[in-house]
């Protein structure tokens, strides 16, 4: 099955502490149905030092995965979150915005 949200897409968070925020998808975890969005859903992780690798210990801030159902693709034409559909054009499967019918770039 084709993914409606892909890496490098700009998305808006629909629910949770970061509701309404926009960011770029950096990673899609297909098996878990989650995405990692740049600058969104940041958590603090306590990390032990690893002297063999030269890593210092401390508290590290990183992005945690968000369920794909809690984000929507950002439509720059309308300035809002939008749903995505698929259709066949010239023998290729392409994504389009359901509200405007425009192709997703």
Curated annotation (Swiss-Prot):
CDD domains: KOW_RPL26. It comes from the Bacteria. Keywords: Ribonucleoprotein, Ribosomal protein, RNA-binding, rRNA-binding. GO terms for molecular function: rRNA binding; structural constituent of ribosome. GO terms for cellular component: ribonucleoprotein complex; ribosome. Signal peptide: none annotated. GO terms for biological process: translation. One of two assembly initiator proteins, it binds directly to the 5'-end of the 23S rRNA, where it nucleates assembly of the 50S subunit. One of the proteins that surrounds the polypeptide exit tunnel on the outside of the subunit. Belongs to the universal ribosomal protein uL24 family. Part of the 50S ribosomal subunit. This is Large ribosomal subunit protein uL24.
């Amino acid at each position: 099955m084709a993914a409606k949200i892909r890496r490098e897409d700009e998305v808006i968070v629909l629910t949770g502490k970061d509701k309404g925020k926009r960011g770029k998808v950096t990673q899609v975890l297909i098996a878990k149905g989650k995405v990692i969005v740049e600058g969104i859903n940041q958590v603090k992780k306590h990390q032990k030092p690893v002297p063999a690798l030269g890593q210092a210990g401390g508290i590290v801030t990183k992005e945690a995965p968000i369920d794909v159902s809690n984000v929507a693709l950002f439509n720059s034409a309308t300035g809002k979150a939008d749903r995505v559909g698929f259709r066949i054009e010239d023998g290729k499967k392409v994504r389009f915005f359901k509200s405007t019918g425009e192709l997703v770039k």
